[in-house]
Amino acid sequence: GFSLQDELDFLKKLHDEELADVQAQIQDQQVQVDMDMAKPDLTAALRDVRLQYENLATKNIQESEDWYKSKFADMTEAANKSNEALRLAKQEANEYRRQVQALTCEVDALKGTNESLERQMREIEENFAIESSSSQDNIARLEEDIRNMKDEMAKHLREYQDLLNVKMALDIEIATYRKLLEGEESRITTPLPNLSSFNLRDAILETKPILENTFSKKVLIKTIETRDGEVINESTQNHDDLE
């Protein structure tokens, strides 16, 4: 498109051409008047014609200049408005550019924060996995220790039960022999009617039924049943036995 300067140059050229055309017409009329100097009756008419053309030329020149000045003023105002609009557009563009730069910096900062958070999350997940694995190992080890302790406790309880049963049996046997010996001592210290007919073996055999019928003892047997180190059943039984 044409710029303001191009349009002004075009108007000036047009004005110059119109002015030259009017001047040429006046010159032609002047030549015609000079050629017709011999005609006195046309002198006044030619003078009037020349005056009319001069007035017309002056009017055209003035109108052209006024139009040119008006057009120039309009274009200058339009140019000023365009310059103001351009200035505002540049200012707005600069503001948009500043906002874009600020948003770009903010986006970069958010990206950095996001990457940092993702890295921390990965580290937390890795640490959690390690701690979880370690905890599972510890739990498995503790469960194994508990099972071993329960087995060991059950073993000790069984050994204790066996020892208790053996002790009870020994106590019963010792008490039985003690009573037998006390009974024999009592028979020996008793006066015998005929020593020649006394038989120690017969005396012991005779004494044993008497002791069995005379002395008795309550035997308490306590049974403890365990499973995995825990007592699941406990019972007590009374038995009559010799002492």
Curated annotation (Swiss-Prot):
Residues 23-45 are annotated as: Linker 12. Residues 1-188 form the IF rod domain. The keyword Transmembrane helix does not apply. One of the most prominent phosphoproteins in various cells of mesenchymal origin. Phosphorylation is enhanced during cell division, at which time vimentin filaments are significantly reorganized. Belongs to the intermediate filament family. Homomer. Vimentins are class-III intermediate filaments found in various non-epithelial cells, especially mesenchymal cells. Vimentin is attached to the nucleus, endoplasmic reticulum, and mitochondria, either laterally or terminally. This is Vimentin A2.
